[in-house]
Amino acid sequence: GVMVMILVLSVMNGFDHEMRTRVLGMIPHATVESPTPVSDWQALARQVERHPRVEALAPFTQMQGLLTHEGKVQKVLINAIDPEQERKVSIIDGFFQEGSLDSLQPGDFAMVIGDKAAAKLGLKLGDKVTFVAPEVTVTPAGMFPRLKRFTVTGIFHVGAGEIDGALALANISDLARLQRWKPDQVQGLRLKFDDLFQAPRSAWEIAQTLDGDFYARDWTRSHGNLYQAIRMEKTMIGLLLLLIVAVAAFNIIATLIMVVADKGGDIAILRTLGATPRQI
């Protein structure tokens, strides 16, 4: 029972550590966004930073689309970031196989990509890859999808298939240009709290204090499957520990009953000689 308990706790603690350090270290605890581009994200950041649980924040813009290279296609979510600010809210810097965040300089249209997506597309450092945006450009010749060539300047491996196979990073001003925004316009802010499990309440409190058409969304909503996995993990730990304790208690009781039954003859002799139950 003790061996099984130690084994179960070790496995669950390892799972919890990997979940926290890898997956939860990559996604924001919450985001503050607006339906329209945010022109002065620094002013928004000053409002958000007033909340006592906010440890760090960084601007971001997201865009879904397709990457194509030599006839191969892969769906992708581009997270456009400011490399210096992103280090405050994400641990991506520690998972690069090649390149680094510093390669994402404005105007270069550089991109870093997960190793699974790179392998599927046959990409290596320095290759050109075409991003196909889910929008069209209207010209006198007709409508054409919006395309942009990026240069692969980094490859990372986090160890989570959802991230390694479908996430790419680019500079935030480059994606603003691709979306025909001003270079300093962003979609919103990524937040990091001192306690990620307080994110729902903290995000709600922040949303109540913001002026304008802003809304906050915490990680339990944006990554609901991950939240359910963590809840299931905690429930399973409780059930397994309860089962292990019950089995151990049953073994102890069974052993005591067998010992008493085995000593039945000796007890009868002692009672015949006049010994009281207390003396026995």
Report residues per predicted region:
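Amphipathic alpha-helical segments that mediate coupling or scaffolding at interfaces
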Residues: 18, 22, 155, 192, ...
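Mechanotransmission and gating elements of multispan inner-membrane complexes involved in transport
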Residues: 36, 135-138, 143-237
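A structural signal for hydrophobic secondary-structure junctions
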Residues: 46-184
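Short amphipathic alpha-helices in soluble, non-transmembrane regions
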Residues: 44-49, 92, 202-209
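Internal alpha-helical transmembrane segments
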Residues: 2-4, 8-18, 22, 26, ...
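Membrane-interface junction motifs in transport/secretion proteins
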Residues: 16-46
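Hydrophobic alpha-helical transmembrane segments of multi-pass inner-membrane transport and secretion
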Residues: 1-13, 231-268
